[in-house]
From Swiss-Prot:
Species the sequence originates in: Mus musculus
Quaternary organization: The nucleosome is a histone octamer containing two molecules each of H2A, H2B, H3 and H4 assembled in one H3-H4 heterotetramer and two H2A-H2B heterodimers. The octamer wraps approximately 147 bp of DNA.
Entry GO terms, CC: nucleosome; nucleus
Composition bias type Basic residues, residue spans: 7-19
Posttranslational mods: Deiminated on Arg-4 in granulocytes upon calcium entry.
Protein name: Histone H2A type 1-H
Coiled coil: none
Protein keywords: Acetylation, Chromosome, Citrullination, DNA-binding, Hydroxylation, Isopeptide bond, Methylation, Nucleosome core, Nucleus, Phosphoprotein, Ubl conjugation
Residue positions, PTM N6-glutaryllysine: K96, K119, K120, K126
Length: 128
């Protein structure tokens, strides 16, 4: 008999992370571990960490996109906490979600009450 059956088992396939399977950048395995260790429930389904990682990734991308726009509006190439603050507070839905959140070094939105603004006086100078 020739060497049939002596090739051994199949070569182990290259490991593929659950994040790459789901097409995500956020770590599905780490989210799963944190859900298990966090005493949220006795058991954690396989889809829960994937869904949660996807939601976190989406929210992060949304905030970073708006903060990048705020940085570009201020002619800066680096996002600072001020840009995050401006991005969140100028977006209605993000502001509602993060309404009670304080961003360190974020400052406040520029806002001057209308009553405090100088009155526009209509002075008509009649040339005679």
């Amino acid at each position: 008999m020739s060497g049939r059956g002596k090739q051994g088992g199949k070569a182990r396939a290259k490991a593929k992370t659950r994040s790459s399977r789901a097409g995500l950048q956020f770590p599905v395995g780490r989210v799963h571990r944190l859900l298990r260790k966090g005493n949220y429930s006795e058991r954690v389904g396989a889809g829960a960490p994937v869904y949660l990682a996807a939601v976190l990734e989406y929210l992060t991308a949304e905030i970073l996109e708006l903060a990048g726009n705020a940085a570009r509006d201020n002619k800066k190439t680096r996002i600072i906490p001020r840009h995050l603050q401006l991005a969140i507070r100028n977006d209605e839905e993000l502001n509602k979600l993060l309404g009670r959140v304080t961003i360190a070094q974020g400052g406040v939105l520029p806002n001057i009450q209308a009553v405090l603004l100088p009155k526009k006086t209509e002075s008509h100078h009649k040339a005679k």
